[in-house]
Amino acid sequence: MCYLLRRSVHTEFYIFHAKGLFMGKVKSWCRANAMLVISLLAAVVTAFFVPPDRDYLGYYDLKTLACLFCVLAVVGALRDLHIFSALSQRMVHTFSTVRGVCTALVVITMFGSMLLTNDTALLTFLPLGWFVLSSTGQEKHTALLFILQNCAANLCGMITPFGNPQNLYLFSYYDLSTKMFFFAMLPPFILSTVLILLCCLVFPKEQLSVPEAQVTVDSCRAVIYGGLFCLAVAMVLRLVPYVLGLTVIVLALWFLDRHALKTVDWGLLATFAAFFTFSGNLARMEAVHILFARLLSHGTILISALTCQIISNVPAAILLSRFTQDACGLLVGVNVGGAGTLVASLASLITFREYTHHVPNGGKQFLFLFSGISFAFLTILLAAMSFLNG
């Protein structure tokens, strides 16, 4: 009897322990994929008000999803080749001061975001920034460097249609011409670039020695992947049918680098799909449609930027596009709105996660500095755009 009792107690203990481990993993996954969880909940809640029907099929912009997938997949393949590290290190090793190296890293992130999307640029170049600073004993500058790299990725990637996910979506949704897109984004891009470069002057001119790092690149694959990247860009610019481009890129990577297909940010794609459902349902609710249409009539840039502070810029772009035809105003608003709160851009969460990974006890100090710089950028950019738009 005692044996059976002990066995029952042990069994209950193991079950309780297993449940605890499972719930811990669920909580950890939810924290790591917070935006996906929120978007799925939002889609489910709105589905109670607008039950699923055939109209749901019209919510999803398959071209945007295909283009985003292709860009992420090809960039993943290029990262697997370490080509970005090789190019970045070559630039970094030409500078000899803290200011020079940190400015180079910020500029690399800036140009990287124009070609690779903002989140991919940060995933690629933040670790390089930590490597350089930690290997030269300059870890104290990590927070400021990461914040300026984050600003560069969020605010300078706005100049290209594929510089961030919301641009890719709006460029496709409104069927914008490249010329219209470029001229709409040029003023905030120039101002953002100037502000970021001015902030880089804060870094000291202290001399340092950056250790050499051996990085080998397969030149043959680099050429092939470069061609695939050009194909992905051509898809975004509507020079190539997206079905054809998707087929070629998937088949090429299937044979050359399946790992790149596995490392695609499927959570981001799922987030897009969920927010397509959420925004589509909201657009079919008459009261919501009237509310957003009325708000946006008072200033698309301001309202969209403020919306980003609460639900992030990608969801804001998808949601608000249903209620306004002011494509340029919405473009500027959701890009400028990437500054401000930590949740204003998905890329900012990547930066915070990377920083706390290297400096586990520095989260509060980082958030304080991040908020000060980011809100300053947001205020200046909104004031400038308000002045330019009369």
Model-inferred region functions:
Residues 61-64, 93-106, 135-146, 219-223, ...:
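Membrane-interfacial loop-to-helix junctions in multi-pass transporters
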Residues 26-31, 54-64, 176-187, 214-218, ...:
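Interfacial loop-to-helix junctions that mark the boundaries of transmembrane helices
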Residues 23, 89, 202-226, 258-262:
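Flexible interhelical linker loops that connect adjacent transmembrane helices
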Residues 182-193, 302-390:
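C-terminal transmembrane helix pair
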Residues 59, 81, 85-88, 228-325:
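Transmembrane helical segments that form the transport core of multi-pass membrane transport proteins
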